[in-house]
Each structure stands twice: as C-alpha cells, then as structure tokens.
Amino acid sequence: MDWFHCNQCFRKDGAHFFVTSCGHIFCKKCVTLEKCAVCGTACKHLALSDNLKPQEKMFFKSPVETALQYFSHISQVWSFQKKQTDLLIAFYKHRITKLETAMQETQQALVSQDKELSVLRKENGELKKFLAILKESPSRYQGSRSITPRPVAITSPSQSVTPRPSFQHSSQVVSRSSSVESVPYREAGFGSLGQGGRGLQGRRTPRDSYNETPSPASTHSLSYRPSSASSGQGIFSFRPSPNGHSGHTRVLTPNNLAQRESRTTLESLPSFQLPVLQTPYQQQRQMGLPSGREAWTTSR
C-alpha cells in the first residue's frame, strides 16, 4: 500500500498508526486524543492491526480485489436470477403454445358455426317467406290439396246407333251429347213430345255436333214410353238386346235424374247414343197402327 502515510508528518514506516473517525491517519507521535490535528474536529481514534473487523478492513484492501470479490458476488446473484427468469420464460412459452392451439381450434369452430348459422338463416328466411304466403292465402293451398282429378268416361265416336227401319225418320237426326246436362228429359206433356225431340236435336255441343249412322249390329236397345197421360213425365229404359250379356234394365225418370247424375253419367254407359224422338202420331203413321199410346223402341 504505497498510499499509506501519516497525515501530519508524512512518514510511511512505523509500527503503530491510528485512524480517526473523521478519516485521517496519524502516527504514534502526531496523534492527539482531544481533536483531529488536521481538521481540528473532535474525533475518535482506532489503532490499526490485523484484528480489525471486516467492515473496517475493507478500507485498506486493494480496489481490484474488492471489485473481484464483488463481481463474484454479483455473478452469483445474476446467475440465480437468470435461472429463475429462464424458468418463468419456459412456463410462459409453454402456456403460449397451449393458448395458440386452443385459439386455432376456437377459430375453426367459429368458422364452422358461421357456416351453419348462414345456412340456418337462409332456411329461416325461406320458411318465413313460405309462412307469409300461407298467411296471405291459406285457402288456396288447402283447396289445392283437397281437389283430386276425377276420371271422365269417353265414348268412341266410331260406335253408332241404328234405329229399326220401320221407326227411322229421315228428317230427324239426333246428335250424340257429351254430358247428361245437355239432354232435356223433362216433357211438358205427352202431346208436346215432338217439340221435345226437336229440342234435343237443337241442344248440341261443338265437339258432338256430328251425325252418326245407325248400325244394325248393335246389341243394346233404348226405349221411351210415357208413364201416364196425366203426369206428362217420360221414362227412358236402357235394356240390352236378347244377344247381349246383361239381363237388367236401367230406368231414368226426371224425378230421380238428380240422384243418378251424382253416381254415374250417361257417357259412362258403353256406347251410349240418344234415340230419335218421334211423336205418337208419327209412330202410328209408320207402323200403320190405330191411334193409341204405345212404347217405341230404338235398336242400338
């Protein structure tokens, strides 16, 4: 220590030196007990020896040695703190990795839910539109479900009706009617039968306004007879010929026409053709019979 000397006489050699509380060094000759000889302040004195305390010895050591000692301590402190910091960083890195994985899964689920939500919104909009249409016109959809197509009987126009030669009248030809509504079955009286026949000839639909040629090969017959002179009602009787397969007779009167019309139509019968209506006077002239009410039959 080349810096060590007495602050009063500046000597370096000697065995006994003292240091004051005010920071001055004195040799044994220059030291004063009352006050410091350099600054004149009251102070305490401490004799320098090898038995000094560590906090007192540190002032007489080399700064490099003190620095190395402190650097070693600082390095230990820094290593300890760095180790703790590394552990904390590793924990945060692991946690960040887990959070990133969870975030990716959440994003995928969110995309899937967005697609499903868009589909549900589209379906909901369509259902709302359909519900609005149903609220506006509910009877139209209910009516369309309740209406079912009904079969329509169609008679081939190639089939024809042939009256008997003795009863055929060239001036009266009755066209086939397409439905039961176009045939007037009500007669005002037996005397107006000719007028009713002309009315049947006049009421024709455009599709059925053609004449048919009678055929002698017909197997069915149609007859008309008045029920009584006073009632003024006619009876149409459909009966097959002796060569036919059916053995029953169908009778249509103006009274039960409405009931028959609800169950079947005349066109549903096989090859139905309207008869040639004649007055009793014309029948008597053709047959050469005396006056009287007799049934007339038209072969089909």
UniProtKB/Swiss-Prot annotation:
PTM comment: Autoubiquitinated.
Ranges in a coiled coil: 88-124
GO BP: any one term: homologous chromosome pairing at meiosis
Any GO MF annotation of the entry: SUMO transferase activity
Stretches annotated zinc finger (RING-type): 6-40
Keyword Transferase: yes
Listed EC numbers: 2.3.2.27
Polar residues bias locations: 155-169, 211-234
Keywords of this entry: Chromosome, Coiled coil, Meiosis, Metal-binding, Transferase, Ubl conjugation, Zinc, Zinc-finger
Keyword Acetylation: no
GO cellular component, one term: synaptonemal complex
Subunit structure: Homodimer.
The protein's role, per its UniProt record: Ubiquitin E3 ligase that acts as a crucial factor for crossing-over (CO) formation during meiosis. Essential for normal prophase I progression and for ensuring appropriate CO designation in meiosis. Recruits key components of the cross-over machinery either directly ou indirectly, leading to the activation of the MutL-gamma complex. The function of RNF212B in CO designation is dependent on its catalytic activity.
PANTHER family, per the entry: RING FINGER PROTEIN 212B (PTHR22663:SF29), RING FINGER PROTEIN NARYA-RELATED (PTHR22663)
Name recorded for this polypeptide: E3 ubiquitin-protein ligase RNF212B
